[in-house]
Amino acid sequence: MFANTTAGGVYRWSDGNVSTVLEKRRGIGGIAVHADGGFLVSGRDLAYAGPAGLRTVWAADGATGLNDLTVAPDGSVVVGVLRHQPRRGEAAGPTELVQVAPDGGTRVLASDLLWPNGVGYAPDGTRLYVCEYAAARVRVIGPQGASVFAEAPRGECDGLAVDVEGGVWVALGSGGGIARFDSGGALVELIEVPGRFVSSLAFAGTAIYLTTIGALLRMDVGVPGSEIPAAAMQID
């Protein structure tokens, strides 16, 4: 599945065919599969999409929206909070990355991120990586706190995915490509995607699917992605 952030909606690609899964909702920065077969989407809030339609499960006070997200090993959801209006040209100020537990309780994992974007866990679940779009870097959050993990070789750090070897893949936005960093933060691969703004990426086996402005692309990178569990948030 993938979202059209500007025009709105969630779509499914299968065997060359695209179908609409959720209509109209704009500003979606992330999607996560839920354990009951529905899915969660960000946007103006964190919402559950199921047979009965959309239902808000969490919203951040004073936020302009919620951006990219992932699922933690315990089934909780980690999501970046937006507090500026990027479409109005507002500069990004420090904001939070929040973990929303299955029972709805929250914990702030970081509070000084400049436009939190792509987010993903290391295969062993001990470290969490998050892109800072406005700072063009990736931060890592671990037992000792948060630190800078890697800097974008060009462009920005937008979407993020992690492979089973601990490699961290980053969509480089206006940089026209994707980068792979090893678990120590060293750049080990830079793949060109000419003429494209690469906004996000996700694994399916050894293939990476890339979202760009106007296109969905696929490439095989020879290593599978780290498994992301289904969200276990309670839906009333």
Q: What are these model-derived regions, one by one?
A:
Residues M1-E23, L46-A47:
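Beta-propeller domains
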Residues V198-D236:
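Blade-level signature of beta-propeller repeat domains, shared across WD40, Kelch, NHL, RCC1
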Residues K24-G43, D61-H84, P94-E96, A110-R127, ...:
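Beta-rich, blade/repeat-based domains predominating
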Residues T5-T6, G43-R44, L82-H84, A92, ...:
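Short loop/turn segments immediately following the C-termini of beta-strands
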Residues W13-N17, A49-G53, V100-G104, G142-G145, ...:
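Short loop/turn segments that connect beta-strands within beta-propeller blades
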Residues A136-R139, V148-S183:
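Loop/turn-rich, solvent-exposed surfaces of beta-rich toroidal or solenoidal domains
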Residues N17-E23, G53-A60, G105-S111, G145-E151, ...:
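A short beta-strand motif characteristic of beta-propeller blades
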Residues G9-Y11, D45-A47, R88, T95-V98, ...:
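A short loop-to-beta-strand structural motif that recurs across blades of beta-propeller domains
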